[in-house]
Regions:
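Conserved C-terminal helix/tail region of periplasmic/extracytoplasmic solute-binding proteins
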Residues: 305-324
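Bacterial lipoprotein signal-peptidase II cleavage site
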Residues: 28-42
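Short, solvent-exposed loop/beta-turn-alpha elements that line the ligand-binding surface or hinge
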Residues: 69, 220-224, 288-297, 317
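Sec-dependent bacterial lipoprotein signal peptides
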Residues: 1-29
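Solvent-exposed, polar/charged alpha-helical surfaces in well-ordered, non-transmembrane soluble domains
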Residues: 56-60, 64-65, 87, 91, ...
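Pocket-lining segment of extracytoplasmic ligand-binding domains
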Residues: 102, 178, 183-268
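Secondary-structure end/capping motifs
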Residues: 239-310
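Short, glycine-/small- and polar/acidic-enriched structural segments
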Residues: 39-168, 179, 195-199, 214-218, ...
Length: 324
């Protein structure tokens, strides 16, 4: 078991998900996976994860030997987020990656063979749209015509904002979403480069400490039941390594059970793989974890994506789920 330094610069701007996927479709046809074995169990597996509080279960499973106990030789790699991790998955750099479901659906809709093998986190109070304390914005409809910082242009954050604005009677098409890494959004907000920002723990707690305020929770009302992110692999890897997939999913579920509601564990663990202090972790809103894939939630996400133009037409997500 090991953790490998970050492969992608989380502070640099990245191209939109669709552009990255288009490049993958052209460049990686026929590529294999990193650790697959034809006998149904991978000799070793590479896992790409974004370093957040939300990915504590996968790190915990590695650090405590849960993966090893399940027969998996795991190597963890940090990524710059799901939209950037998916091309690396298809290119064979990883066997499993953590991604938001919007990026996963976009990939599948454009023909990439990605499948969801496990859930991870569900929308809760750990996500929020935030503004400065002296902001003139006071309700969701006020974002009409505003500039909002998000960590990826085609992501669950922009999708949820669009759904909430529509529910409030505003036009989400008039929101200007700007792509920025989470750690620099606060400075951009203070400098007036953006009017509001999407923050997720532990950055939400840090923003509150800096004096910023929650304009509205991101997952409420029309977005209250949305799953946020989970774990995907390629169809080839899932078909060729069913034992590895089952072991990964079962181990993640065990780890979620151990991590869930154990703040002391998180206070000790999260600072080891993020730049977040134990003091901040002690104050964060706890994520809501669920390792089970959510077919209905994924379908609802795809329906919203079609409504707001993230995909061109209705998309059946049934074949995206690889679960018992």
């Amino acid at each position: 078991m090991s953790r490998v330094p970050e492969r992608a610069d989380g502070r640099s701007r990245v191209t939109a998900t669709t552009a990255a996927i288009a490049a993958v479709l052209l460049a990686t046809a026929g590529c294999g996976t990193a650790g697959g074995a034809a006998d149904g169990a991978a000799d070793s597996v590479g896992i790409g994860y974004f370093p957040l509080v939300h990915t504590a279960p996968v790190v915990h499973a590695d650090e405590t030997g849960l993966f090893a106990d399940a027969g998996l030789d795991v190597e963890l790699h940090t990524t710059a987020g799901g939209a950037q991790a998916i091309p690396s998955l298809i290119a064979g750099e990883y066997d499993f990656v953590y991604t938001n479901y919007v990026s996963a659906v976009i990939a599948a809709e454009q023909g990439l063979p990605v499948v969801v093998v496990a859930g991870n986190d569900v929308g809760a109070d750990d996500h929020a749209i935030m503004v400065t304390a002296d902001s003139p914005l006071s309700e969701p409809a006020d974002l009409e015509g505003a500039t909002v910082g998000v960590n990826s242009l085609q992501n669950v954050g922009s999708l949820a904002v669009s759904a909430i604005l529509e529910d409030a009677g505003a036009d989400p098409g008039l929101v200007d979403f700007v792509e920025l890494p989470y750690p620099v959004m606060g400075a951009a907000l203070e400098q007036g480069e953006i009017d509001a920002m999407w923050q997720v723990e532990p950055f939400t707690t840090g923003a509150l400490a800096d004096g910023h305020e929650v304009l509205f929770p991101l997952f409420d009302g029309p977005t209250g039941d949305l799953p946020v992110a989970g774990w995907i692999t390629t169809r080839d890897f899932a078909d060729e390594n069913p034992e590895a997939v089952d072991a990964f999913r079962d181990t993640l579920s065990t780890s979620v059970d151990q991590v869930r509601d154990d703040r002391d564990l998180l206070v000790d663990l999260v600072p080891t793989y993020t730049e977040v202090s134990a003091e901040v972790v002690a104050e964060v809103a706890m994520p809501v974890w669920d390792a089970a894939p959510d077919p209905e939630g994924l379908a609802a996400t795809a329906d919203l994506m079609e409504r707001f133009g993230l995909i061109g037409e209705a998309f059946d997500t049934t074949e995206m789920i690889d679960a018992p």
